[in-house]
């Protein structure tokens, strides 16, 4: 497996306690990835989760082989990843963020608007942040605007609502 085939699911924010717990900022919609017994790559090294404790949007994990604060401190700011082969299959029309970032955004007539740079997860709907000249376009991920997402062609076709690109 090449290094490009790993998917980011979190980042080590700090240590928790003297027994080597790691406080991880979670970047996945599947919190069960952090259940005890699962394997994670932390700093590109494979570990097994021995214990988990949730605290709001963060999780405290204890990993096999990390049992003191000094060893845990070496992993501060490390990326937490899983192999791409461990990704859950999503329903049709639902995508992982990494699949959308970098896609070209075009309007109904094929005119290039920009490229997806970021996805903002808002309560009502996601917002696709696209480059747009020297500015950014904030594209609501709703059916009235986003007409097609085609991973094979690498394009998102939109029908901009009035004012969207002003």
From Swiss-Prot:
GO terms for molecular function: ribosome binding. Residues 92-164 form the PRC barrel domain. GO terms for cellular component: cytoplasm; ribosome. It is found in: Cytoplasm. Pfam families: PRC_RimM (PF24986), RimM (PF01782). Gene3D superfamilies: PRC-barrel domain (2.30.30.240), RimM (2.40.30.60). Keywords: Chaperone, Cytoplasm, Ribosome biogenesis, rRNA processing. Its main location: cytoplasm. Signal peptide: none annotated. PANTHER family: RIBOSOME MATURATION FACTOR RIMM (PTHR33692:SF1). An accessory protein needed during the final step in the assembly of 30S ribosomal subunit, possibly for assembly of the head region. Essential for efficient processing of 16S rRNA. May be needed both before and after RbfA during the maturation of 16S rRNA. It has affinity for free ribosomal 30S subunits but not for 70S ribosomes. Belongs to the RimM family. The PRC barrel domain binds ribosomal protein uS19. This is Ribosome maturation factor RimM. It comes from Dehalococcoides mccartyi (strain ATCC BAA-2100 / JCM 16839 / KCTC 5957 / BAV1). The lineage of its organism: Bacteria, Bacillati, Chloroflexota, Dehalococcoidia, Dehalococcoidales.
